[in-house]
């Protein structure tokens, strides 16, 4: 595992009112085994940065490296898992089937059992057979987190993964993130929640299109 590296990331969005320079030469590195949080005010470009890092949006300049290679397209789920705010759960699959999807794509045995274990750890094991439309957004969010970590990717990028969780359910999500890092994953989490920041090894702050150390 080589973790995540980004160098000189630039991203400008063009609107009728003129260009908006969201990212201005962003450099960052997350080593295997690190949980790093990304802070910054709303609209500072955290989601835009995660999309570029995951390969789902193209930077205007700069490079992203994972698994020792420069990204030219979205990496496989074994290399990088992205947990966006738009969760992307498949409506025709149960929560357990959604969580197990990366394992089934990789033809890993015991996928539903592992998925159910993760859902239980996140406090929603009894909902494993429900469909996304039948549960709350916070419960969907926990299922999406389980799906992101189940395949043990080299890099995990998460955008506000505890934003819709209450004080009872958030600690389990934080433990799952911390455990992923402790197992060797490079974890970068955009968050406003103090509990996630406290569990992190360090915090980066995005402001004015640039990264500083929190």
Predicted regions and their residues:
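The feature captures the beta-strand-to-loop junction immediately N-terminal to the Walker
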Residues: 39-41
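Conserved ABC ATPase signature
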Residues: 131-135, 139-141
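ABC ATPase NBD coupling module
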Residues: 20, 69-81, 105
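Helix-to-loop junction immediately C-terminal to a conserved catalytic motif
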Residues: 54
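Catalytic Walker B motif of ABC-type/P-loop ATPase nucleotide-binding domains
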Residues: 156-159
